[in-house]
C-alpha cells in the first residue's frame, strides 16, 4: 500500500516486509520465467479478465432457464472438477476436467443479449480449458485455472449460480506470486487449488452463492 506522494517518491506504508523489493522494470522477465516453468502468463490472464469485466462491473444480470441454465451448469461443474483435482494435486484429473470444460463451453447455445455476453467468456473457457488439458505439468494446469477462476467468478455475477447446490468464492493472498487470487469451490472449508497439499487450507471464504442467486460485487 502506498502513502501520499513525496516529491517524486511514494512511500510504501503496508504490504512490504523489510528486505523485500518492489519490481518496477522486470515484470516482463518474471512473467516470461513463469511461462517457461509451465505456468500461464499473468499478463494474458489479466487480458482475459477484460472479456466480461465490463458487463459484470456494470451490475448486468441475465436470468437463464431450462436448457440454457443446464448448459452453464455443465461449464461450472467441469470447472469445479478441476478445482477439486488441483486441490488434491491430481494433475491427470485436472487435465481431464480441462478437456471437459472446453467441450462444455463449446456446447453452450444462448440467444440475444445472453449470447453476446457469453461469447467472450466462452472463448476464455475454451482456450484455457484446452490449455489445462494440454498442460505438461500441474503448474501449467494451475496457470490456466487462474484465468478460468476469473471467468467463473464473472459467470456467477452475470448469470447467477446455475447449480442446485451453493458455491463459494475463496481467496488466497499468497497465490499468483503473492498478488493473491480467487477461485470458486463447493466445499465450506478452504481447499486451495493453487498450492494443493502444501498449503491446502491457506485462504478464506469470501462469499457463498446459493442456487439461482448472483455473486455480488464488481467482476475483477
Pin down the residues of each PLM region.
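Intrinsically disordered, low-complexity terminal tails/loops enriched in metal-binding residues
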Residues: 1-220
Amino acid at each position: 500500500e502506498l502513502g501520499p506522494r513525496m516529491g517524486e517518491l511514494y512511500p510504501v506504508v503496508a504490504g512490504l516486509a523489510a528486505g523485500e523489493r518492489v519490481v518496477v522494470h522486470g515484470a516482463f522477465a518474471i512473467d516470461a520465467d513463469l511461462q517457461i516453468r509451465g505456468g500461464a502468463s499473468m499478463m494474458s490472464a489479466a487480458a482475459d479478465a477484460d472479456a466480461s469485466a465490463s458487463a459484470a462491473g456494470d451490475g448486468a444480470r441475465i436470468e437463464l432457464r431450462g436448457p440454457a441454465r443446464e448448459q452453464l451448469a455443465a461449464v461450472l461443474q467441469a470447472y469445479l472438477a478441476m478445482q477439486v483435482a488441483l486441490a488434491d494435486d491430481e494433475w491427470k484429473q485436472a487435465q481431464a476436467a480441462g478437456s471437459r470444460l472446453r467441450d462444455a463451453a463449446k456446447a453452450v447455445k444462448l440467444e440475444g443479449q445472453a449470447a453476446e455476453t457469453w461469447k467472450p467468456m466462452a472463448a476464455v473457457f475454451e482456450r484455457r480449458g484446452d490449455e489445462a488439458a494440454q498442460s505438461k505439468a500441474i503448474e501449467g494446469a494451475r496457470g490456466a485455472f487462474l484465468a478460468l477462476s476469473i471467468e467463473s467468478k464473472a459467470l456467477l455475477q452475470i448469470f447467477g449460480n446455475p447449480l442446485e447446490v451453493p458455491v463459494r468464492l475463496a481467496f488466497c493472498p499468497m497465490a499468483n506470486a503473492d498478488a493473491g487470487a480467487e477461485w470458486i469451490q463447493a466445499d465450506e472449508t478452504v481447499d486451495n487449488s493453487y498450492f494443493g497439499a502444501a498449503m491446502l487450507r491457506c485462504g478464506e471464504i469470501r462469499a457463498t452463492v446459493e442456487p439461482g442467486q448472483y455473486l455480488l460485487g464488481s467482476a475483477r
